[in-house]
């Protein structure tokens, strides 16, 4: 297929399925916590606006959660079908970590999801709120275990190699490896930020069409407060994550910077734009700021950033991809900070809900969080190459033995099936968003209907005959 061998087709297939999958957990994590906040506000204030927003977003959450589960299962199977070399080599670590995720997070989510989605008038309000909080907690726990596994692949420790296989010797070191805290914070905050932008864009769409209800205004306001607070925090977390990467994966940082060689005694410049050329080993058309690279990455003007030529050619990641994926992520992050700042200014001026240029800006920024997450993961995963377990196992040694034709057919099948199934799912979510929150109705009088209320009501109805 397109002149690619089975190895590269397997990489493309996994990148395709992962890219589809990551979108759903990112929104699920943020929406679950958002729903917990909405229900908490409803219980505290009895303001029907919060109840209306809860019912509106819980439907979208349910669709998104279902698609995330399906896409995640397919991705997990690929460890055995396409990457059996990796599973055989490192399965004693990645297998238990994924099992812990199922036992602690997925069971928690599955156990309380039904109560959360269908128990509003069937269980008491306290129990229902508890169920919503447990689902939100489950998404965070799931993030914990998944990122522990991925971070171990980036900065492996706590293991020995015995008879050509990884054997864990210190599970605390395996889980809390050097990059894990930064990656967990960075991804979790990215999920909250992406969800805020998603919610804000949905509200902006309704405001642009004159749907200026209290519920729409409330979710727009909440989303922009979240963006204002979280976007700058995310930038600071990203800076800390970058310093950690500089320490443990210097070749990745060199590729991100498009930096090929140092001049003795001079600080490293910051390349704003350019085109890293892997064949000529230089960055063409570079626009740079002297010394700023050293200042940002080492917080000093006396230190230099590692250069790509300091690493063997076979150990360098593809700088062209990593250079631009990082800049896409960082550029979108700056726009998010700008969005939050403009919202604060317009809020002060009393024009937050009436400025049509700003509403259009908020609408167009809706997918920016998800795009930034995808760009960030491209930076992370392509920047790790040519290793699947950094410095321990090469990606070429991890792939299963498949023919080029078989991989081509399976890749095309994935593209068609994913495009069809998840296209329908996305379309349905957009239909739900277009409907908007329903006007708040006064709560029903009396006690909530219990699980056996249907049978009881039926028996009473028969007696009335």
Region spans (language model):
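Polytopic transmembrane helical bundles with strong interfacial aromatic enrichment
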Residues: 1-465
């Amino acid at each position: 297929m397109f002149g690619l061998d089975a190895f590269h087709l397997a990489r493309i297939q996994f990148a395709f399925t992962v890219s589809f999958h990551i979108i759903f957990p990112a929104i699920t994590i943020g929406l679950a916590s958002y729903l917990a906040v909405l229900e908490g506000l409803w219980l505290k204030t009895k303001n029907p606006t919060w109840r209306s927003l809860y019912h509106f977003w819980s439907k979208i959450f349910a669709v998104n959660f279902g698609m995330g589960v399906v896409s995640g299962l397919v991705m997990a199977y690929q460890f055995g079908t396409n990457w059996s070399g990796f599973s055989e080599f490192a399965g004693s670590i990645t297998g238990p970590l994924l099992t812990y995720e199922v036992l602690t997070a997925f069971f928690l989510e599955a156990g309380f999801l039904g109560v959360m989605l269908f128990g509003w008038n069937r269980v008491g309000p306290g129990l229902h709120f508890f169920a919503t909080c447990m689902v939100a907690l489950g998404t965070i726990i799931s993030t914990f275990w998944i990122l522990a596994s991925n971070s171990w692949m980036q900065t492996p420790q706590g293991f020995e190699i015995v008879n050509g296989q990884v054997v864990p010797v210190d599970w605390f070191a395996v889980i809390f490896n050097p990059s894990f805290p930064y990656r967990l914070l960075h991804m979790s905050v990215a999920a909250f930020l992406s969800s805020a932008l998603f919610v804000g864009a949905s509200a902006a769409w309704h405001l642009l069409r004159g749907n200026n209800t209290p519920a729409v205004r409330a979710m727009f306001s909440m989303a922009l407060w979240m963006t204002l607070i979280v976007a700058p925090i995310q930038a600071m977390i990203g800076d800390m994550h970058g310093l950690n990467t500089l320490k443990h994966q210097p070749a990745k940082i060199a590729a991100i910077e498009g930096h090929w060689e140092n001049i003795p005694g001079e600080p490293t410049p910051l390349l704003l734009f350019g085109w890293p050329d892997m064949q000529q080993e230089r960055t063409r058309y570079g626009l740079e700021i002297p010394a700023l690279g050293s200042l940002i990455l080492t917080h000093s003007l006396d230190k230099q950033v590692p250069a790509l030529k300091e690493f063997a050619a076979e150990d360098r990641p593809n700088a062209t991809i990593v250079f631009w994926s990082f800049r896409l992520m960082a550029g979108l992050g700056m726009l998010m900070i700008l969005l939050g700042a403009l919202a604060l200014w317009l809020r002060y001026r009393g024009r937050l809900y009436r400025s049509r240029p700003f509403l259009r800006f908020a609408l167009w920024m809706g997918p920016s969080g998800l795009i930034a997450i995808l760009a960030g993961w491209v930076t992370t995963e392509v920047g790790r190459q040519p290793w699947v377990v950094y410095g321990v196992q090469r990606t070429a040694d991890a792939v299963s033995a498949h023919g080029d034709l078989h991989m081509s057919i399976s890749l095309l099948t994935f593209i068609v099936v994913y495009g069809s199934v998840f296209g329908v799912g996305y379309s349905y979510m957009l239909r739900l968003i277009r409907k908007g929150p329903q006007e708040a109705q006064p709560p029903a009088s009396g006690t909530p209907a219990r699980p056996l209320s249907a049978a009881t009501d039926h028996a009473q109805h028969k007696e009335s005959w």
